[in-house]
């Protein structure tokens, strides 16, 4: 246990890393320049093969494939591809479909430029006892923890946390606690033996078209308004925090003496600080408005720099990225804002903070229409003051689909690994 804690602290403190800052602390980091950005992509009818796919884009400016599509792996059909992440050894990439709850496992180690689909798990709902909508995939030692959004009884927001081992065998289901039954993201801080979960909405809402949903007063009542603090090792809830407005992505601070996390609320457009108090409990406090909440800019993804100084906040409806100085986490200061596109969703930055990547798609039925339905991966350089464009991949022109979550890969990392059974 002490060794794991020391590793987590050292990884958090190192300024030389080039991996994403939101990765599981149980996962090895890649160092130096990332070679690839892996993009889990929703299929679009009439665009290419129309299927969900894992897209590999070159990210090393010294390589011939820089800023270009290197490879694609289609899975057949459209399943609402959304989130995914690596196993604790980064050998495999686990991904899921929010609609039919199928899991996909890709081998990344054999050829990092050309991932290979090696396993499909179509028993997630049955294995888990009725959980629907696998969302966040979080690496644990020898296991993958999956947060979810819904259930198969009423397709509402009651849901659970589900664990598989790295071989794809079901381990356990832990249902969300009473009066905090909704789920979304999950993040662990090993130093504190604390896990945080957030809350969104169920299948009956997220698979509905956005204008119709927002015009349905009853449906809009069925969004989460809580975060849960867990005893991580015991998998037991210890606190329920009131965070009105659908708290989404969670980002723990990365420096070893910073015992707090950030989230944003989609419906109320606020940055929230989830901070540990002197007595060990946590308190949730709104610390900043994001743009004009009355206009519902819809905050989606966030990314915290490795030094805990900058928080990048994407807002879907206006296509903006806003960068806040959160050196004082209680008083975020807006330092930069930039239009990324007609719509923007995910943001990923390298550990050094020099490279920041954006994708455009939120959900297949929530994305904009017509000329505003831009679908892209865009790369920028961040110099601490402003974002400068590096490259742009048009996922429609490339016949790929709707790009969502991103993860980084590197040839050198895999050449230096020895995997059991390989």
Regions found by a protein language model. Name each.
Residues 269-271, 294-377:
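Loop/turn-rich, solvent-exposed surfaces of beta-rich toroidal or solenoidal domains
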Residues 87, 179-183, 187-321:
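Beta-propeller domains
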Residues 109-190:
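Asp-box/WD-like beta-propeller blade repeats and closely related beta-sheet repeat scaffolds
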Residues 66-136:
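Blade-loop segments of beta-propeller domains
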Residues 57-65, 105-115, 273-284, 323-331, ...:
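Short loop/turn segments immediately following beta-strands, especially the blade-tip
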Residues 32-49, 147-157, 198-222, 359-377:
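Short, conserved, GDST-rich strand-edge loop motifs in beta-rich repeat architectures
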Residues 19-59, 65-98:
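Beta-strand-rich domains and repeat architectures in extracellular enzymes and scaffolds
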Residues 20-28, 49, 76-88, 126-143, ...:
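Beta-rich, blade/repeat-based domains predominating
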């Amino acid at each position: 246990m002490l060794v794991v804690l020391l590793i987590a602290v050292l990884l958090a403190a190192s300024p030389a890393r080039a991996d994403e800052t939101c990765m599981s602390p149980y996962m090895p980091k890649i160092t130096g320049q990332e070679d690839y950005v892996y993009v889990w992509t929703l299929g679009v009818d009439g665009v290419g093969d129309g299927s969900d796919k894992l897209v590999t884009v070159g990210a090393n400016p010294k390589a011939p494939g820089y800023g270009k599509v290197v490879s694609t792996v289609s899975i057949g059909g459209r399943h609402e591809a959304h989130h995914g992440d690596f196993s604790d050894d980064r050998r495999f990439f686990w991904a899921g479909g929010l609609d039919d709850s199928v899991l996909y496992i890709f081998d990344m180690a054999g050829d990092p430029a050309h991932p290979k689909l090696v396993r499909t798990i179509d028993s997630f709902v049955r294995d888990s006892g009725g959980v629907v909508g696998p969302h966040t995939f979080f690496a644990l030692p020898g296991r993958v923890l999956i947060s979810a959004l819904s259930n198969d009884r009423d397709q509402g927001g009651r849901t659970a946390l589900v664990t598989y081992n790295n071989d794809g065998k079901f381990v356990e289901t832990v249902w969300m606690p009473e009066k905090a039954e909704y789920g979304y993201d999950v993040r662990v801080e090993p130093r504190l033996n604390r896990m945080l979960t957030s809350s969104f909405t169920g299948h009956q809402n997220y698979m509905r078209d956005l204008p119709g949903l927002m015009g349905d007063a009853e449906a809009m009542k069925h969004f989460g308004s809580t975060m849960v603090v867990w005893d991580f090792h015991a998998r037991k809830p210890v606190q329920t925090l009131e965070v009105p407005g659908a708290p989404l992505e969670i980002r723990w601070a990365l420096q070893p003496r910073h015992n707090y996390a950030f989230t944003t609320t989609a419906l109320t457009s606020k940055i929230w600080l989830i901070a540990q108090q002197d007595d060990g409990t946590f308190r949730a406090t709104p610390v900043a408005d994001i743009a004009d909440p009355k206009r519902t800019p819809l905050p989606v993804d966030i990314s915290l720099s490795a030094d805990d100084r900058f928080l990048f906040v994407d807002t879907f409806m206006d296509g903006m990225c806003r960068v806040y100085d959160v050196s004082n986490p209680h008083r975020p200061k807006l330092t930069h804002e930039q239009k990324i596109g007609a719509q923007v969703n995910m943001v990923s930055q390298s550990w050094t903070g020099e490279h920041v990547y954006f994708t455009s798609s939120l959900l297949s039925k929530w994305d904009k229409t017509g000329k505003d339905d831009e679908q892209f991966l865009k790369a920028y350089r961040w110099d601490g003051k402003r974002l400068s464009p590096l490259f742009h991949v048009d996922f429609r022109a490339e016949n790929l689909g709707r790009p969502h979550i991103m993860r980084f890969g590197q040839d050198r990392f895999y050449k230096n690994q020895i995997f059991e059974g390989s």
